[in-house]
Swiss-Prot record:
Catalytic activity: octanoyl-[ACP] + L-lysyl-[protein] = N(6)-octanoyl-L-lysyl-[protein] + holo-[ACP] + H(+)
Pathway assigned in UniProt: Protein modification; protein lipoylation via endogenous pathway; protein N(6)-(lipoyl)lysine from octanoyl-[acyl-carrier-protein]: step 1/2
Name under which the protein is recorded: Octanoyltransferase
Membrane-crossing segments per the record: none
Function: Catalyzes the transfer of endogenously produced octanoic acid from octanoyl-acyl-carrier-protein onto the lipoyl domains of lipoate-dependent enzymes. Lipoyl-ACP can also act as a substrate although octanoyl-ACP is likely to be the physiological substrate.
Further information: In the reaction, the free carboxyl group of octanoic acid is attached via an amide linkage to the epsilon-amino group of a specific lysine residue of lipoyl domains of lipoate-dependent enzymes.
Organism: Nitrosomonas eutropha (strain DSM 101675 / C91 / Nm57)
InterPro entries per the UniProt record, alphabetical: aa-tRNA-synth_II/BPL/LPL, BPL_LPL_catalytic, Octanoyltransferase, Octanoyltransferase_CS
Subcellular locations according to the entry: Cytoplasm
Single biological process term from Gene Ontology: protein modification process
Chief place where the protein resides: cytoplasm
GO cellular component: cytoplasm
Membership in a protein family: Belongs to the LipB family.
Length: 225
């Protein structure tokens, strides 16, 4: 696991440390338990963390998840989790960015945080001259109507966990077995299909950088502009 510490200041002017951890491929249940433990044990002084990782193939159902959105069974496990939202798929080649943040520290409400999460992905796509957008009806980020990133959060004790799942270079076939995020017929896409050649490690680093820029109101100028 690689760790990088970054010091950033929100609009309050105070400096806070954000620790970015690269955790490789991690079982979903292992990561979920670790997030719950971190949030339960954190204090007002605990630095915030961003975890970058991938999961082995797994379907996760949010607290609003309905069984009928799993269209047919497979050998991929289905885990009922505590994030918001419906069912989605995680697998190798999808960048998971888990956000373990003290929302009071950053003076953020849930809607503001969701907009910043969407903004991080939208700005990442802009670095590659790809137009992406969020949706008020179906949180996430879309390119030409196809979903490239899913969002999900759990708020507890004034802090959040879970985060963003960004499709980089993965097998999209398992999405056929579900109504992604509860929407029948919703198309999905990924960075590779959009002509992005940077590998997932580069994309993960840029995604984290863009999210931190959203938190701290900094502007990142895309390379080559």
């Amino acid at each position: 696991m690689q760790t990088k510490k970054l010091n950033h200041a929100p609009k309050t002017g105070y400096m806070f440390t954000v620790t970015v951890k690269n955790m490789g491929i991690t079982e979903y249940l292992t990561a979920w338990q670790a997030m719950k433990d971190f949030t339960q044990q954190r204090t007002r002084e605990t630095p915030d963390e961003i975890w970058l990782l991938e999961h082995p193939p797994v379907y996760t159902q949010g607290i609003a998840g309905k069984p009928e959105h799993l269209l047919f069974p497979s050998n991929i496990p289905v885990i009922k989790t505590d994030r918001g939202g419906q069912i989605t798929y995680h697998g190798p080649g999808q960048i998971i960015m888990y956000l373990l943040l003290d929302l009071h520290r950053w003076q953020l409400g849930i809607r503001q945080l969701v907009r910043k999460m969407e903004g991080a992905v939208i700005n990442l796509m802009d670095e590659y001259d790809i137009v992406a957008n969020g949706s008020q009806d179906a949180p996430g980020v879309y390119v030409n109507g196809a979903k490239i990133a899913s969002l999900g959060l759990k708020i507890r004790r004034g802090a959040c966990y879970h985060g963003i799942a960004f499709n980089a270079d993965m097998d999209l076939a398992p999405f056929v077995a579900i109504n992604p995020c509860g929407y029948p017929g919703l198309r999905v896409t990924q960075a590779k299909e959009l002509g992005i050649s940077d590998n997932k490690e580069v994309l993960a680093g840029k995604l984290a950088q863009n999210f931190i820029a959203q938190l701290t109101h900094r502007i990142i100028t895309p390379h080559g502009r």
